[in-house]
Design a protein with these regions (language model features):
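An acidic, low-aromatic, low-complexity terminal/linker signal
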Residues: 1-177
């Protein structure tokens, strides 16, 4: 197979550009730090989840309700050969219990993994860290978000997953199932 001259030139140009990226020393002022985010909607409001703070995503599983004094607990589900507790992300963020169907589970934690149930997934985005700003969260998620990101004319609160995990641990410790 022969490659036409314009295509061969473009390939050579791309190859040279690729090689140059390894020849330039990395420094913090030359390399823009990025953050990978999942864009979701909770009760119709736009939110973002940091990919580095989650351990996986699975499609919705049958969730078996269990008696609990923890209102955010939806039940347990079988994921990756084991059982995980499934919590409503909307309820953890302070929203009233929603009747929206659960479409996906976001896995969080490593030693005691839990799943956060959500309905609307809007996509995966890589943004510059400079696009993420610290600010005062708005109701109802006050205390559960500490940052916001603006992409394509939409400002999204960035959910603080470690904070949610601590909240779950406190609630479960105070009210065992």
């Amino acid at each position: 197979m022969t490659v036409s001259p314009p295509v061969a030139e473009k390939l050579a140009e791309l190859r040279d550009a690729f090689d140059r990226t390894f020849a330039v020393a990395r420094s913090s002022h030359l390399v823009d730090q990025t953050e990978d985010l999942l864009f979701v909607r909770v009760a119709g409001d736009p939110y973002a989840l940091k990919v580095r703070q989650i351990s996986g995503i699975v499609s919705s599983r049958k969730t078996i309700a269990v008696p609990s004094r923890v209102p955010e607990l939806l039940g347990v589900a079988a994921v990756r050969g084991g059982f995980v507790s499934v919590y409503s992300l909307a309820a953890l963020l302070g929203y009233a219990p929603a009747s929206d169907p659960v479409r996906m589970l976001v896995m969080c934690g490593s030693k005691e993994p839990v799943a956060l149930a959500l309905g609307d997934f809007e996509g995966y985005f890589r943004v510059s860290s400079r696009q993420i700003h610290t600010g005062e969260p708005t109701e109802p998620a006050r205390g559960r978000v500490k940052q916001a990101v603006r992409v394509a004319d939409t400002t999204r609160a960035v959910v603080d997953i470690p904070n949610l995990m601590e909240l779950i641990e406190r609630r479960v410790g105070a009210h065992p199932i």
